[in-house]
UniProtKB/Swiss-Prot annotation:
Descriptive protein name: Imidazole glycerol phosphate synthase subunit HisH
Species this protein is from: Buchnera aphidicola subsp. Baizongia pistaciae (strain Bp)
Lineage: Bacteria, Pseudomonadati, Pseudomonadota, Gammaproteobacteria, Enterobacterales
Catalyzed reaction equations: 5-[(5-phospho-1-deoxy-D-ribulos-1-ylimino)methylamino]-1-(5-phospho-beta-D-ribosyl)imidazole-4-carboxamide + L-glutamine = D-erythro-1-(imidazol-4-yl)glycerol 3-phosphate + 5-amino-1-(5-phospho-beta-D-ribosyl)imidazole-4-carboxamide + L-glutamate + H(+); L-glutamine + H2O = L-glutamate + NH4(+)
Keyword tRNA-binding among record annotations: no
Keyword set, alphabetical order: Amino-acid biosynthesis, Cytoplasm, Glutamine amidotransferase, Histidine biosynthesis, Hydrolase, Lyase
Length: 196
């Protein structure tokens, strides 16, 4: 089974690659269209800014590849946000518009930004991503922007306000947290995705 991590040019991909390999899968990091379209599963990671990530996706013409891809895709952190309509970052960034909802800065009030550390994830809807994972398990987060509650939300987290911790639309899944940095529950989630 070919597993692909899309090289978004703005993420530390080694921890994700290592986590997938620990589960017994071969994985490649690439932006090659053919490799992506022939993969059984695709990961869309991201750390940093929506602007730089979308610039890279446009530069390598990966938007159309993702629109054509029919197998499961998992967006992680910024990768989940890239699936959305737009981000309020930098006066507005158009994104992939697969999840028809905007990404906005977290309304943190007295809570510091970025939201950095472990937080509980409450599952809203039965979903294959969370099989074998206790509700309200802790996952590792690092972000300042968030997708608020919406029709595609399958799990949520509270950090001054509730926001989407995980979303799904058809073959596209997204998680705001980093499963590859979330210990055994994170590995279980990655395993669940790889077995869909």
């Amino acid at each position: 089974m070919s597993i692909v991590i899309i090289n978004t040019g703005c993420a530390n991909l080694s921890s994700l690659k290592y986590a997938i390999q620990r589960l017994g899968y071969n994985v490649i990091i690439t932006s090659n269209h053919k490799n992506i379209l022939n993969a059984k599963k695709v990961f869309l990671p991201g750390v940093g800014t929506a602007f730089s990530a979308m610039k890279m996706l446009n530069q390598f013409k990966l938007k159309d590849v993702l629109y054509k891809y029919q197998q499961p895709v998992l967006g992680i952190c910024l990768g989940m946000q890239l699936l959305c309509s737009f981000s309020s970052e930098n006066n507005g960034i158009k994104m992939l518009d697969i999840i028809h909802a905007p990404v906005n800065i977290l309304k943190s009030n007295k809570f510091p930004l970025p939201h950095n550390g472990w937080n509980n994830v409450s599952v809203c809807d039965e979903n294959p991503l969370f099989i074998g994972i206790k509700n309200n398990s802790k996952f590792y987060f690092l972000h300042s922007y968030a997708l608020y509650e919406n029709d595609y939300m399958i799990a949520k987290t509270f950090y001054n306000v509730y926001f989407s911790a995980a979303v799904r639309k058809e073959n596209f899944f997204g998680v705001q947290f980093h499963p590859e940095k979330s210990g055994l529950v994170g590995l279980q989630l990655l395993k669940n995705f790889l077995e869909i």
